[in-house]
Amino acid sequence: MGDWKGMIDVSGFINTYDNMIEFSFGFYNPSNGNQIDPYTSAGLAELIYVQQTLGYTINQIIGFGAQNVENARITGVELSFNSMGKIGEVEVVSLIGYTYMNPVSLNNEPKYSVYNSDSTTNMLKYRFKHLVRADIEAVYKKWSFGVSNRYNSFMRNIDKVFEEPIAQNTYILPGLKAYRSVYNKGNLVFDARVGYQINDTFKVSLIANNVFNSETSSRPGDIQAPRNFLVQLAMKF
C-alpha cells in the first residue's frame, strides 16, 4: 500500500495430550513416590509417619515430582502483524504478535486438582492465557529509535504449597499469596533503545530495559530485573 508493506498472519492450534506429565511441587513419600497432601488429617499423619518412623528428612520429602495428569488439551490462536515503510525520510519497522491459549486438564478427578492454588478451575499450572509482544523501530539517517513491550496475563494456577502454610505458620514463600492477590493483572514491561551507526562496521546503542521500573514476576519467587541501562557496541563483519 504505497510505500508501506505489511503482512498479517493468523493461525490456530489444538494440542491434545494422553498421559501428560507435569512437574508438581509438594511433599512425596520417598518409599513409594506418592504425593502427600498435608492439608488433610490423613496426609498429615502420613507425613509424620514418613519422618518419624521411616526416618526421612524434610529435604528428602519436599520438592518437585513428575505427576500424571492424564489427558490435557491446549487450544489457542496466534496473530502477528509485520510492517515496514517510510514517513518522509524516516523508515519505520513494526512487529506485533498476540497469542491466546486455553491450557486445560481433561481429568476431573479431585485428587489431581487438590494440589493446585485454584482448584475451581481445570487450567494447567504455570500457564498464561494471553501473551503480547510488540516492537517498533524508526530509522533516520544514522540514528535509530526503538520501543518494545511484552505482556503476559496473570498466572492463575500454581502449586498450592507455595501459597498455603505447610505446618501452622510455616511457609515456603512467605507473603506470596498476598503478593499474588495484589499483582493479579499480569505483567507489562516496556523497553527502549537509541542507536547511532558510526560506520558500516560499528554501531553504538543505549538500551533501557524495564523503562517504567515495573515490578514483575514470571513465576513464584522469581522477581524480574528492575530498570537497567546498557551501552552496546555492535560490530558487523
Segments (PLM) and residue ranges:
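Solvent-exposed loop/turn elements at secondary-structure boundaries
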Residues: D3-K5, Q51
